[in-house]
Amino acid sequence: MEEIVNTDLGSYLRQMRERVRPEQMGLQARGSRRVPGLRREEVAALAGVSQTYYTRLEQAQTAHASPQVLLSIARALQLSADERDYLLKIGTPVQNPQQPAPHDDQVSPSTRMLLGSLGNVAAAVLNYRCDILGWNSLYHRLFAPHLGFDAPERPEQRPNVIKMNFLDDNVRSLYADWAAESESNVTYLRFISGDHRHDPQLAELIGELTIQSEEFAALWCRQRVSNCIEGSKLFDHPVVGELELMYQSADLQDGNILKFYHAEPDSPHEAALQLLMVDLDSVHHH
């Protein structure tokens, strides 16, 4: 079964090789270098594989390699843990690839109760494609008050975090550093594509974003990967102004992801978040 999400091992190796400076590896920059980064023979030597074999991998004459070889190449290219995991995924054949099992895009009743009970935390349930399957009032108020609260429950118009980031000006203007936010969106999408190379809906999402956003297309081509599970973001919110929030992600039993945003206790940011909740309550009572 063919892979429909393009996760090209050869071009990924080439981009990672071009990123490494010879000096980082203790290599003399001997002679004039026509191209950035390490030469193929240098990577092969550092990884302990033949230059011919490494070249075949990079030129896609060999589609896969053993995990041991891939780990050696990852060390030679100084890949991060997330980049190494991605390399192992795209460089190893999928065992007995099946049509992807239909993913359950429903939020369980207990998870829905949990969402509702997280009062001072903005929380949402996402699938791996970053479609929003459910959110609590605060998440809705923080990110998408211009959409109906029931939008996640309607599959045909379900909001997608990455599409909103690139294609919805209301959301785009929320981030104090939109460039950093969009880069982390794309590096995450690239990371999870290693696990879901046969998913037509993921391929469709990537295709749609590539056509509709030049910025997305440029970032996607860079092939950077990271599994963005926690960190902090600075918002410039139209209702409460500047807001710095920490975020974390947790895997749910059904394969979906619980994403939540919270402020540092007793900080001005917590006060701003509470103001957003008060504003919310006043809206509910009118």
Cite the ranges covered by each PLM segment:
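Short amphipathic recognition helices of helix-turn-helix/homeodomain-type DNA-binding modules
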Residues: 2-9, 13-14, 67-71, 75-106
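Recognition helix of helix-turn-helix/homeodomain-like DNA-binding domains
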Residues: 30-34, 40-41, 47-64, 74
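Amphipathic, well-packed alpha-helical segments that form the structural scaffold of globular domains
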Residues: 14-21, 88, 92, 116, ...
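A short, Lys/Arg-rich alpha-helix, primarily the initiator
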Residues: 1-38
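An N-terminal domain-cap segment
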Residues: 24-38, 96-117
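Hydrophobic protein-protein interaction segments
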Residues: 109-127, 133-286
